[in-house]
Amino acid sequence: MEVAAKLRGAGMSAQKARLVADQIRGKSVEEALDLLTFSTKKGAALIKKVLESAVANAEHNEGADVDELKVSTIFVDEGLTMKRIRPRAKGRADRILKRTCHITVKVADQ
């Protein structure tokens, strides 16, 4: 049994979120939560919330035992990119790209 949770439109680039996602792929849920709790990366807090949601979904909807769950799949896709403008000297302007991402976490029995 595999249960998923998604966060769409997370306010960070997919490249930065993937750094954290790669660390917990394949680990047990308990080990992954410990790693995310003590990580200093911004993406760790977002991924931790999605992982906790997936665990809650598995426990509530499927009646799974939390101690036997592991992170079977985790991936980060690019979301919308919002374009903003920063005024510069002499009437020029630079384009600012505010990137977002979609985080998907799937947990399964070991």
Swiss-Prot record:
<dbReference type="GO" id="GO:0003735">
    <property type="term" value="F:structural constituent of ribosome"/>
</dbReference>
<dbReference type="GO" id="GO:0006412">
    <property type="term" value="P:translation"/>
</dbReference>
<dbReference type="InterPro" id="IPR005727">
    <property type="entry name" value="Ribosomal_uL22_bac/chlpt-type"/>
</dbReference>
<comment type="function">
    <text>The globular domain of the protein is located near the polypeptide exit tunnel on the outside of the subunit, while an extended beta-hairpin is found that lines the wall of the exit tunnel in the center of the 70S ribosome.</text>
</comment>
<dbReference type="InterPro" id="IPR047867">
    <property type="entry name" value="Ribosomal_uL22_bac/org-type"/>
</dbReference>
<comment type="similarity">
    <text>Belongs to the universal ribosomal protein uL22 family.</text>
</comment>
<dbReference type="InterPro" id="IPR036394">
    <property type="entry name" value="Ribosomal_uL22_sf"/>
</dbReference>
<comment type="subunit">
    <text>Part of the 50S ribosomal subunit.</text>
</comment>
<dbReference type="GO" id="GO:0022625">
    <property type="term" value="C:cytosolic large ribosomal subunit"/>
</dbReference>
<keyword id="KW-0694">RNA-binding</keyword>
<keyword id="KW-0687">Ribonucleoprotein</keyword>
<dbReference type="InterPro" id="IPR018260">
    <property type="entry name" value="Ribosomal_uL22_CS"/>
</dbReference>
<dbReference type="GO" id="GO:0019843">
    <property type="term" value="F:rRNA binding"/>
</dbReference>
<protein>
    <recommendedName>
        <fullName>Large ribosomal subunit protein uL22</fullName>
    </recommendedName>
</protein>
<comment type="function">
    <text>This protein binds specifically to 23S rRNA; its binding is stimulated by other ribosomal proteins, e.g. L4, L17, and L20. It is important during the early stages of 50S assembly. It makes multiple contacts with different domains of the 23S rRNA in the assembled 50S subunit and ribosome.</text>
</comment>
<dbReference type="Pfam" id="PF00237">
    <property type="entry name" value="Ribosomal_L22"/>
</dbReference>
<dbReference type="InterPro" id="IPR001063">
    <property type="entry name" value="Ribosomal_uL22"/>
</dbReference>
<keyword id="KW-0699">rRNA-binding</keyword>
<keyword id="KW-0689">Ribosomal protein</keyword>
